Each structure stands twice: as structure tokens, then as C-alpha cells.
Design a protein with these regions (language model features):
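Non-heme di-metal
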Residues: 1-236
């Protein structure tokens, strides 16, 4: 298990700099309106369908990062290899959990069986994660996928978990334990994942240039995440 250590000054500055970007995700109108049950079913279903490619591809992004772990048996190679491998196995379950989430909220199962072409505002985050996890450093890939995505996701799922019950009496929606499994899982365990991701980033981003790149990647990932959420109002 990766041990959480005190942050060096550059990580404190990193966290301060990305806080506004994270807040635009966690406090997004989508989640506020889920809490108040004013998000329309059409908007909810549009998001569930068009975010599915991100969910389905997420273990692939992590596998791209796994391929960058330096060969050998050094401490951080072992830790990072094991951490990514374990998380990939877990993430492979999440696409199925998301499908149950969507179907429970009235999305026809066939809509998730065919290829999905998300609007560009939503698909941008997929393209960015493919690029960073394919072509950038291990630290940047971890910053994008495992910190900038998993961190805010752990926070917003906590906010909406109980509020989803507000939709129970809506016609065509069936809420049960399996429907909420994706949200429940992320609300419960993603607290530690971002902290562990930061430890890996600290181990591999050693120069000022690498540290600046990690920061910029996290910011841009969160910008695309917020853009994708905002588009739910303009498109669906």
C-alpha cells in the first residue's frame, strides 16, 4: 500500500492552483440540480449516455500509464505497477455499473450497446486523456486520469448519492442497490485514490519543469471535465 506523506511546498502550491478548477466540477450546476431534482430526465439521460465512452475507456487510459512505469524492481516501480494494475481490474467493472446506473434512470440498454458519438464539448476530455496518457510522462498521465478525474468525482458523488433517491418516484426510473453501485463505489473509496496518485506524482515529477507540466495537465483536464458537464444544459 502506498503511504501518504507530508506534501512538499510545490504540491501545496499545485493543490492551491487547481482548487478553482476542481470547484467548477464539484459545484457544477448539474450536481446542484440533481440535489434539488430540477435536472430534467432528458438532461440526466443525455449525460449518462454521452459520458459512457469516458467511463468505458478509463481503464485503457490507466493501462497506457502502466506501460510507462520504468522497468525493474525499484520501490516506486513496484508500487506504481501494483497500484495501477489493481485499479485497472477495479475500473473494468465500472462500465457495467455505469450501464446499470443509466438503465435504472430510463436509458434504453440498446443506447449503450451501439457506438456513441458524444458532442465535441464532452468528447474533448476523451481526446485529451488519450493524448496525455499516450504521449506525455507517467506523472502527467497520473495527474490527468487518476488525480484530475478521480479527485473531483469522489467529491461530487458524495454530494449526489443521497439526492438520487429524489428521482425514485419518477416514471420509468428504477432505483436499487445495483442502480447506485457506481455512485456508491466512487463516493466511498475515491478519497484515498487521489492522495495515492499524488504520492506517485511526487515520486516521478522531480524537476521544476516536470512539476509545472503536471500542474498544467491537471488544470486542463479539469477544464474539459467542467466543459463537458456544462454542455448538458446546452445540448440535451
Amino acid at each position: 500500500m502506498i503511504r501518504i506523506t507530508p506534501h512538499p511546498e510545490w504540491i501545496k502550491e499545485f493543490l492551491d492552483s487547481i482548487e478553482p478548477y476542481k470547484n467548477k466540477i464539484v459545484n457544477n450546476r448539474v450536481f446542484r440540480e440533481i440535489e434539488s431534482r430540477t435536472l430534467t430526465i432528458e438532461q440526466f439521460q443525455g449525460a449518462l449516455i454521452n459520458f459512457y465512452p469516458l467511463i468505458e475507456s478509463f481503464p485503457k487510459y490507466m493501462a497506457l500509464n502502466l506501460a510507462k512505469v520504468p522497468a525493474g524492481n525499484s520501490k516506486w516501480s513496484r508500487y506504481t505497477r501494483y497500484w495501477l494494475s489493481t485499479n485497472i481490474n477495479q475500473e473494468r467493472l465500472h462500465a457495467d455499473w455505469w450501464r446499470r446506473f443509466a438503465v435504472g434512470f430510463g436509458v434504453p440498454s440498446k443506447a449503450l450497446e451501439e457506438e456513441i458519438y458524444p458532442p465535441p464539448e464532452i468528447d474533448a476530455i476523451n481526446h485529451y486523456l488519450w493524448r496525455i496518457c499516450t504521449h506525455s510522462s507517467l506523472a502527467e498521465g497520473i495527474s490527468a486520469a487518476n488525480y484530475a478525474i478521480e479527485g473531483p468525482t469522489g467529491e461530487w458523488t458524495k454530494k449526489v448519492k443521497s439526492a438520487l433517491e429524489n428521482y425514485r418516484d419518477v416514471q420509468g426510473i428504477e432505483i436499487n442497490e445495483k442502480t447506485l453501485e457506481w455512485v456508491t463505489a466512487h463516493a466511498s473509496y475515491d478519497d484515498r485514490h487521489p492522495d495515492e496518485a499524488l504520492e506517485i506524482i511526487k515520486a516521478y515529477a522531480l524537476t521544476k519543469e516536470e512539476q509545472e507540466q503536471v500542474k498544467q495537465v491537471a488544470k486542463r483536464t479539469m477544464e474539459y471535465y467542467a466543459l463537458a458537464l456544462d454542455s448538458c444544459y446546452e445540448i440535451f
